[in-house]
Amino acid sequence: ELSSKPQPDTRSRKLVVDFYKLLARHCRQHRDVAFYADALCITTTYLYKVCRKVLGFSPKEEIDQQIVFEIKNYLTNTDLPIKRIAEELHFEDASYMCRYFRRLTGVSLADYRNEQTRL
C-alpha cells in the first residue's frame, strides 16, 4: 500500500545526504546555514524547504544537534578545559558556548561533564 504522505524526490534526498556529508566535515568551523547552502549551490530558503520536507526539521536544528554532539564528545572523552573546547569548535568565547549548550540541552557544560565522569 502506498503511503498517503508524499515521498521526497530523489534530488531532495541527495541534497540532504550531501548536506550531512558537509556537516560532518565542516561543523567544527561553520554553524551557519548559508555556508552549507552555498557549498551545495542552493539558496538557504531552498535548503530549509528540502530539509523540512525530507527530515521534518530545519538545517539549523540539525547543525545545532551536530554541534551539541561534538561538545558532548569533547566533554566525555577529553579533559580539555571548556575554553579550549570553545576554541576547537570556533566559538567566539567559552561563555557563549556555555549559553549555547545550556539553551539546547537544558544542562550546563560543567554539570554534563560531571555527570559523565560519574558514569
Language-model segments: residues:
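Basic, amphipathic alpha-helical hairpins
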Residues: 1-5, 19-32, 50-51, 55, ...
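Inter-domain helical "communication" segments and dimerization helices
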Residues: 1-46, 59, 114-119
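Core residues of bacterial helix-turn-helix
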Residues: 40, 89-90, 101
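Residue-level detector of short coil/turn "hinge" positions at structural boundaries
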Residues: 44, 82, 93, 108-109
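Short hydrophobic/aromatic patch on the recognition helix
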Residues: 47, 96-97, 101
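…primarily DNA-binding HTH/wHTH and HhH modules…
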Residues: 99-119
